[in-house]
UniProtKB/Swiss-Prot annotation:
The chain crosses the membrane at residues 70-90, 100-120, 213-233. The lineage of its organism: Bacteria, Pseudomonadati, Pseudomonadota, Gammaproteobacteria, Enterobacterales. Belongs to the UPF0283 family. Residues 1-19 have a biased composition (Basic and acidic residues). This is UPF0283 membrane protein YcjF. It comes from Salmonella paratyphi B (strain ATCC BAA-1250 / SPB7). InterPro entries: DUF697, UPF0283.
Length: 353
């Protein structure tokens, strides 16, 4: 006999289909491609570097607060009042033929004009430093863009700002490498690999020279006050040299602002890297036993100068770092140690002679 039919069962909720993962198409590599295969590099940017970059960006692009607008408005009203009062005094002196007062008004006008001119010049130089950050953002966008038409004009503007002549071999190689079918990303990338390294190499040489001078000065000088004054003077000179190489003319306030930004970046991200670099040397080469205390202090001062120069490069450079072309402290560490050892050996051998 056949079994009786079972009653119908109603479920409160509809059945849910289990999601099935879509399979990707199989990828095969040839023998030639397997030799050139390189795994994708994961950006392991330290958290302190990100905090430093955010702080620098906030300093370069300050928010227009209400208090700042009120102060600027008050200064503008005060300046207009001074100009109006000066015009009134000049008219009264001319009408009463008070030539002494008229001469005083003329002298005051010259002084005020010189002050206004210097303020405008400083503002223009400070604006140029801020504009470099915007150019770096624009270059970063072009390096990730597939559009056409902006890359060449942007790179030519950077070359003109840096004072690179049209007949320069690096710029000529760049012109020979680009063509109309390339997009902005490829054109800016070629500029970063062919023209920008010329300026970067000059900046590296300046950093090496100033770092070596700081190392040797601290190692041989017995006066701490002289050391501090020398290091401060040489660091400011280094910032000026790097800014000039990258086509930025620094005024008084822009120089102080750049120096503050560099120190801010070092305070956030420089201490850990500096201690790591010095620790590697001391552990691997036992420098603490071979060098004197003054020599060790000289190496520390030289590495700090190098760190300051690297950060000044980063703030003055019109292009972001690509393909791990950013200089590291290790690039200057071995050079500083070698120069210091050579100097100490010469100083020890000279009395024997």
């Amino acid at each position: 006999m056949s079994e009786p039919l079972k009653p119908r069962i109603d479920f409160a909720e509809p059945l849910k289909e289990e999601p099935t993962s879509a399979f990707k198409a199989q990828q095969t590599f040839s023998e030639a491609e397997s030799r050139t295969f390189a795994p994708a590099a994961i950006d392991e940017r330290p958290e302190d570097e990100g905090v430093a970059e955010a702080a620098v960006d906030a300093a370069l692009r300050p928010k227009r607060s209400l208090w700042r607008k009120m102060v600027m408005g008050g200064l503008a009203l005060f300046g207009a009042s001074v100009v109006g009062q000066g015009v009134q005094w000049t008219m009264n002196a001319w009408q009463t033929q008070d030539w002494v007062a008229l001469g005083g008004c003329a002298a005051g006008a010259l002084i005020v004009g010189a002050g206004v001119g210097s303020v405008v010049t400083e503002w223009r130089r400070l604006w140029r430093l801020r504009q470099r950050a915007h150019e770096r953002d624009e270059a970063r966008e072009l390096l990730h863009s597939h559009s056409v038409g902006k890359g060449r004009a942007f790179c030519e503007k950077l070359a003109q700002q840096a004072g690179i002549d049209q007949s320069h071999p690096a710029l000529q190689r760049w012109y020979a490498a680009i063509h109309e079918t390339q997009n902005d990303r490829e054109i800016v990338g070629l500029y970063a690999h062919l023209v920008q390294p010329v300026l970067d190499a000059q900046a590296r040489r300046e950093i090496s020279r100033f770092a070596a001078e700081s190392t040797l000065m601290i190692a041989v000088s017995p006066l701490a006050l002289v050391d501090m004054a020398f290091i401060a003077w040489r660091n400011l000179r280094l910032i000026n040299r790097i800014a000039t190489l990258y086509g930025i003319e620094l005024g008084y306030y822009s120089r102080l602002r750049l120096f503050r930004l560099v120190l801010l970046n070092i305070a956030f991200a420089g201490a850990s890297e500096l201690m790591r670099e010095v620790g590697m040397d001391w552990m691997s080469q036992d420098l603490a036993a071979r060098l004197s205390t003054r020599a060790a202090q000289g190496i520390g001062a030289g590495l700090l100068t190098a760190r300051l120069g690297i950060k000044a490069m980063e703030l003055c450079r019109p292009l972001p770092w690509i393909d791990n072309d950013k200089p590291r402290l290790g690039d200057f560490r071995r050079q500083l140690i070698g120069q210091l050892k050579e100097t100490l050996q010469k100083s020890k051998s000279s009395p024997e002679k």
